[in-house]
């Protein structure tokens, strides 16, 4: 792999969603507090509940006193006053666009009945994902003892969110949220700066620095590529956007994507013992892609073993 450009960040990871390759890393396994990146897992479980029919986007949920308190003094914007009722869609968008802590807690209570039960679900899902270093203590990311993760594992949550529930981008890509006649711009400066960026979440904590999970989709060679970047330890909100954009730009300009096999393409056969046919075709239901350094595509010779 070619070396990435100089990125003013303590750690990062860049993932190509189509080829399922990691293109670049720096200290991806360092322990970090997840801060508001916690909301990626919160969002995953909410979309999972919607997908399972446990609640609907148009359902309304109350902003409890506990949810409202989560936003007070946290540095995150509050979405609504205690006692207000908002739809699941509004709460999801508030969490995505504004990083609203009260929205995260209200959604947790709406999905699981209580914050404690929701946090238990978060940690079970982390185990399902195979995450070894991630522990959640709340759904919004406020600093508490025992809440921890790594850039690699947070990036994997982002990848799974996009893979399993791509409809989440409907809320993450919004440049602003209008609620009660008040318009509030997204706190994701990169989304406002780069039209190819359509998510995901920004965060800040003393031990984390300015961090973000970002995703971008750009047309390349007649198709589209989606990249996911997770960057931690930048010195400011502006630097967070600038350095993440630099990493994404390199991911697109430094690599070509080669299609090894098309979806449904028969690439070999397997013999069948005493079957109605003597053999069956072998292939993949999805296209097989690989990202290679720019200019090296002609050297790729796919083989099946």
Regions picked out by a protein language model, each given a short descriptive name:
Residues 132-135, 143-305:
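Domain-terminus/edge residues, biased toward the C-terminal soluble/receptor-binding domains
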Residues 1-152, 159-165:
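Active-site-adjacent loops and short helices of periplasmic peptidoglycan-processing enzymes
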């Amino acid at each position: 792999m070619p070396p990435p450009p100089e990125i003013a960040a303590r750690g990062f990871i860049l993932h190509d969603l189509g080829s399922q390759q990691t293109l670049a890393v720096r200290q991806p396994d360092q322990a970090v507090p997840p801060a508001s990146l916690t909301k990626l897992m919160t969002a995953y479980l909410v979309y999972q509940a919607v997908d399972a029919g446990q609640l609907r986007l148009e359902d309304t949920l109350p902003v409890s006193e506990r949810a409202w308190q989560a936003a007070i003094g946290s540095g995150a914007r509050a979405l609504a006053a205690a006692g207000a009722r908002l739809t699941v869609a509004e709460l999801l968008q508030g969490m995505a666009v504004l990083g609203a802590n009260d929205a995260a807690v209200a959604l947790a209570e709406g999905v699981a009945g209580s914050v404690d039960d929701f946090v238990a679900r978060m940690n079970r899902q982390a185990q399902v994902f195979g995450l070894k270093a991630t522990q959640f203590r709340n759904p919004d990311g406020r600093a508490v003892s025992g809440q921890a993760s790594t850039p690699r594992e947070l990036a994997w949550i982002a990848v799974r969110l996009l893979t399993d529930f791509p409809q989440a981008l409907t809320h993450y890509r919004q440049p602003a949220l209008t609620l009660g006649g008040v318009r509030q711009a997204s706190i994701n400066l990169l989304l406002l700066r780069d039209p190819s960026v359509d998510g995901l979440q920004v965060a800040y904590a003393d031990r984390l620095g300015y961090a973000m999970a970002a995703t971008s989709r750009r047309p390349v060679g007649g198709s589209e590529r989606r990249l996911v970047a997770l960057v931690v330890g930048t010195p400011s909100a502006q630097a967070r956007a600038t350095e993440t954009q630099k990493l994404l730009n390199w991911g697109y300009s430094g690599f070509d994507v080669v299609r090894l096999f098309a979806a449904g393409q028969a690439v070999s056969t397997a013999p069948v013992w005493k079957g109605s046919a003597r053999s069956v075709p072998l292939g993949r239901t999805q296209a097989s892609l690989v990202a290679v350094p720019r200019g090296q595509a002609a050297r790729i010779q796919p083989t099946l073993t």
